[in-house]
Amino acid sequence: MKETMMETLSQRLNALQEKILEHYEQDSKLIYDQINYWKYVRLENAIFYAARERGMHTIDHQVVPPGTTSKAKAYQAIELQMALESLAQTDFNKEEWTLKDTSNEMWQTKPKQCFKKKGVTVEVWYDGNKDNSMHYVVWGAIYYKTHTDTWCKTEGYVDYWGIYYVHEQHKTYYEVFKQDAQMYGTSGKWEVHCNGNIIHCPDSMYSTSDDTVPTTELTAELQHTTPAHTAATTPCTKKTKSAPSCKCGVSRPSETDGVFVDLVTSKGCNKRRHQCCGDTTPIVHLKGDKNGLKCLRYRLRKFNSLYENISCTWHWIGGKGSKHTGILTVTYTTEAQRQKFLETVRIPPSVHVSVGYMTL
C-alpha cells in the first residue's frame, strides 16, 4: 500500500516538476502562464506536505521538506495565484508579465502585496556621507488594489522624506528616510541622490520636530509630469495636482533572448585543461531561481553521460550574495564533454551560465 502511494506521489510530482521546468524554458510574458506556474508550485508543495504527513522523507530520491516549509510555500503560491487571477480580469492582462515580475520576492518587496516593474535605484547619504549610504528602489510602475478591490496602476516618486506613490489623492510612503537616519546617522540629516540630482533639506524643513512626514514637500523635478494614476476597468478617484516630485527616469537594461554565458578563467590560464594552472576540472555554474534549478537538476539526470558530477543547489552568503538565487555546479572530465553538454542540453533563458575551472 505504501509503495503504491509512493509511486502515485512520484508520478504526480514528476509531472508537475516537468511543467515547472517547461515554464522556465518558455520564459513566457503572459499573465495566464504565470498563473499556471503558481498553480504548479502550489500542487508541488501540497504533494510534499501530504508525503511528510504520511511519514515519507524522500520521493524518488528527492528530499521531502519539513511540513511547515511546504505549507508556507503552498500558502505563498495560493496568494500569488489568486492575486494574478484577479489582475488578469483587468485590462492590465494585456501587459507583459514575466516570472520575475510575478515572483514572491517581488511581491514581498516594498510596497508589499503590490506588483512592481521598472525599478530605479536611489541613493541616500546619511549625514551627507557617501560611505554611510543606503540604496532604495523607486518603481516606475506599481499595481495595487484599492479598498473596493479595483486594481490601479501608478508610479513611484521620491522626495526628501522618502519614496511614495499616490493613492486616492493621498501619498502612501513605502520608504521613510527619517527612520533609517535615526538608525544609521547621527545628525538627523541626509541627501537624496537620484539620476544626478541631489535633494537637500533646508533649515526651514529641518527645524520641524514632528515625526510624521510633512505635507509641505521638498522635491526636485526631473521630469515635468505629475504621478500617473490609472485604473484597469473602473476609474480611481481623480487626482489633483500636487507639488512637483522627483520621478527618476525609468529604464531597463536590455536583455537578450538567449542564455547568458560568462567565461571565467584564472589569470594566465590556457583554455586547454592540461595547460591550465595544473590539475583543474572544467565546470559550469548554473545560476537562477532555486525552484527552477531543482527541476533542472532533476531533468539533467537523463544527460548523466554528459557530465561527471552535479551539486545540490547552493547560494553565496554575505557580500552581494542572495539567498533567493541558487547555483548548481556541474563538473566534467574533459572540456570536450563540457562543450557537448552545452550544445546538447537546453538551458532555460532565465538561467545564467558561467563556464570556468576548479581545483578539486
Curated annotation (Swiss-Prot):
Keyword terms, alphabetized: Activator, DNA replication, DNA-binding, Early protein, Host nucleus, Isopeptide bond, Phosphoprotein, Repressor, Transcription, Transcription regulation, Ubl conjugation
SUPFAM superfamilies referenced in this protein's UniProt entry, alphabetically: E2 regulatory, transactivation domain, Viral DNA-binding domain
Domain of life: Viruses
Cross-link annotation Glycyl lysine isopeptide (Lys-Gly) (interchain with G-Cter in SUMO), location: 287
InterPro entries given in the database record: E2/EBNA1_C_sf (IPR035975), Nucleotide-bd_a/b_plait_sf (IPR012677), Papillomavirus_E2_C (IPR000427), PPV_E2_N (IPR001866), Reg_prot_E2 (IPR033668), Regulatory_protein_E2_N (IPR036050), Regulatory_protein_E2_N_1 (IPR042503), Regulatory_protein_E2_N_2 (IPR042504)
General function of this protein: Plays a role in the initiation of viral DNA replication. A dimer of E2 interacts with a dimer of E1 in order to improve specificity of E1 DNA binding activity. Once the complex recognizes and binds DNA at specific sites, the E2 dimer is removed from DNA. E2 also regulates viral transcription through binding to the E2RE response element (5'-ACCNNNNNNGGT-3') present in multiple copies in the regulatory regions of the viral genome. Activates or represses transcription depending on E2RE's position with regards to proximal promoter elements including the TATA-box.
Subunit structure: Binds DNA as homodimer. Interacts with protein E1; this interaction greatly increases E1 DNA-binding activity. Interacts with protein L1; this interaction enhances E2-dependent replication and transcription activation. Interacts with protein L2; this interaction inhibits E2 transcriptional activity but not DNA replication function E2. Interacts with protein E7; this interaction inhibits E7 oncogenic activity. Interacts with host TAF1; this interaction modulates E2-dependent transcriptional regulation. Interacts with host BRD4; this interaction mediates E2 transcriptional activation function.
Record-linked HAMAP family: PPV_E2 (MF_04001)
Assigned protein family: Belongs to the papillomaviridae E2 protein family.
The protein, known as: Regulatory protein E2
Organism: Human papillomavirus type 70
